[in-house]
């Protein structure tokens, strides 16, 4: 293990909360989320964990007296130029390209227009309006690095996913991330004052795959909204959702795209029923989510797969849900399945555990942090549906499930958005202090 990734080194130098007393607290932050708005419901199109992350961080920064503007691309004609996400948080809908959803691979050609609009918005303010830029995903990082140079303020960037990591773990039917993205990510890595990762695994990937400087990386785990996602009455939730009161309910939540492995969930359901035929009438696989991208045919493919496998009657499809409705699905589930081929963290796994529902997940990426194997859920090596079916079967043991339920809640409680935002604030302060120290040194050298 590289020295900078060792646990003692982390405790000594990389704990961002340690800088919480630093004087360089920003007044205003420009957040950039080009391809998806924090106002969208996760689970459909390009809306997912990134939306949740941006919304939660922005709200909590504002609650600490920091104004936040979130710049995102307008995708509908009826969208106003500005929308209020929360007190102190303004979502600015930037016109860049057609006013409709576009696949992410079509967005790079509109980045110049987007960047120009962001720069114009700042130009109408007094000089030095924004203190920090925080960009999310590589497309936003491309905008952020130009704005950072123009405004002379630090760029903090969160990748959320990495092209090289995704390309190394492609699902069947998926397409590789384009070379343009790989180049763009490398440019952002080189330009950012600080790179925020969800886990140490992601930090290593930035160093090993992109040549990132370790001293500029900060690990800040995301959180879970425990005011919403908390344990509740499972039987009541099942009655509300029309699910069997006594039986096995497997839940999948997420965008319906090969990367997330919804087909593995369907195949695992078929495997489970082949070994537990007596549970046919009380087993349900509930898939909550929508297509990823406006041209996706994944929902139809999954329905056809369920029919081909003879389990169409046991598979229920539901559209993306807002948090206050999604929590009912988590509470109703026996287990949540997360068979992703690549995952930078896995907020779905954390939300499920916070509700007291154990998780069966792939042993990949950030899921190895989001789930404690054998304590809050079960991690599965590879993507063989039979292995997932076997893990689901293990949770039929009342003793094991009760143990995992307790462990799931305890593990989720370690992750809170308030801790995350304190970590992010530490990163901002760190970057601001470094910039201002460098400016002071440059001035002193000229005077000397």
From Swiss-Prot:
Molecular functions per Gene Ontology: acetylglucosaminyltransferase activity; D-inositol-3-phosphate glycosyltransferase activity; magnesium ion binding
Keywords, sorted A to Z: Glycosyltransferase, Magnesium, Metal-binding, Transferase
Keyword Signal: no
Pfam families noted in UniProt: Glyco_trans_4_4 (PF13579), Glycos_transf_1 (PF00534)
Alphabetical GO biological process terms: mycothiol biosynthetic process
Annotated 1D-myo-inositol 3-phosphate binding sites: 35, 46-51, 104, 137, 161, 181
Chain residues that bind UDP-N-acetyl-alpha-D-glucosamine: 49, 255, 260, 321, 343, 351
Protein family membership: Belongs to the glycosyltransferase group 1 family. MshA subfamily.
Oligomeric form and interacting partners: Homodimer.
Matching HAMAP family: MshA
Protein name: D-inositol 3-phosphate glycosyltransferase
Organism expressing this protein natively: Acidothermus cellulolyticus (strain ATCC 43068 / DSM 8971 / 11B)
Gene: mshA
